[in-house]
């Protein structure tokens, strides 16, 4: 009852040139109830502005893992859709603890440059292995001795970020990103952002924001007018 509650809003749900309707269902267990304190607003995290490409939104998911799921030409059209970032339990995939595979196809929305790039995946509950175009580029254990991972207890609290090997990202065609998630209990999934691609310079700024805290920085107001 005393926690700040923040929910990601898919951009596709916001009507920028029309009225929007917000409904909040509150369940009170005992004592006083209701929306008890603010701020109440639609906002954004500064770290999402650091992304060269935002990969949050609709992904595909299958609740197991096979190495062939990472193949570039693998057909995932029969997989379920899921919103990232959010736990899979919050989206109706209840009572599942174990391995799941996330897949995302994307074409870069930015131009190729000489600067190193990083794939940032926010927080994942609990462990992960990440493949880009069929190549393993990172896993949970890679984060343990980094500024993002060496101050917090529990894999689910570690912010993931993996350097993209030079020459692996395709700029004129689709890329296939696969994240294998192993949930050891309770909630699972890619549950907190940002999720996307950063330049090395922006990644340095991102690391500084979280060097001493795994909590998101202050939400900045966003005007819709």
What is the predicted role of each segment?
Residues 20-26, 79, 106-137, 177-181:
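Aromatic-lined ligand-binding clefts that engage carbohydrates, nucleic acids, or primary amines
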Residues 5-7, 96-109, 157-163:
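Short beta-strands within extracellular/lumenal beta-sheet-rich domains
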Residues 3, 11, 15-93, 142-143, ...:
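An acidic-aromatic loop/edge-strand motif
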Residues 8, 109, 135-145, 163:
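Short regulatory "switch" loops immediately downstream of catalytic or recognition motifs
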Residues 2, 99, 121-123, 155:
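Short solvent-exposed loop/turn micro-motifs enriched in small/polar/acidic residues
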Residues 93-97, 113-115:
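Surface beta-strand/loop "capping" patches
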Residues 53, 100, 104, 117:
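A broad, low-specificity signal marking well-ordered, structured residues that form hydrophobic/aromatic
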Residues 10-15, 103-115, 122, 164-170:
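Extracellular and analogous surface-interaction loops
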């Amino acid at each position: 009852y005393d926690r700040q509650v923040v929910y990601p809003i898919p951009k596709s749900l916001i009507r920028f040139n029309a009225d929007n309707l917000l409904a909040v269902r509150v369940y009170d267990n005992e004592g006083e109830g209701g929306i008890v304190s603010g701020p109440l607003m639609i906002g954004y995290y500064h770290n999402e502005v650091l992304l060269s490409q935002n990969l949050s939104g609709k992904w595909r998911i299958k609740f197991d893992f096979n190495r062939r799921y990472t193949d570039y030409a693998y057909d995932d059209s029969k997989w379920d859709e899921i919103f990232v970032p959010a736990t899979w339990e919050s989206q109706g995939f209840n009572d599942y603890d174990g391995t799941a595979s996330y897949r995302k196809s994307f074409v870069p929305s930015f131009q190729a440059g000489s600067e190193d790039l990083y794939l940032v995946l926010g927080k994942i509950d609990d462990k992960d292995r990440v493949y880009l175009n069929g190549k393993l580029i990172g896993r949970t254990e890679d984060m343990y001795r980094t500024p993002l991972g060496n101050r917090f207890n529990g894999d689910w609290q570690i912010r993931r970020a993996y350097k993209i090997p030079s020459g692996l990202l395709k700029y004129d065609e689709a890329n296939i990103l696969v994240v294998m998630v192993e949930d050891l209990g309770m909630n699972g999934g890619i549950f907190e952002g940002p999720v996307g691609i950063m330049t090395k310079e922006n990644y340095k700024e991102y690391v500084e924001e979280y060097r001493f805290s795994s909590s998101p920085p202050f939400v900045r107001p966003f005007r819709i007018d």
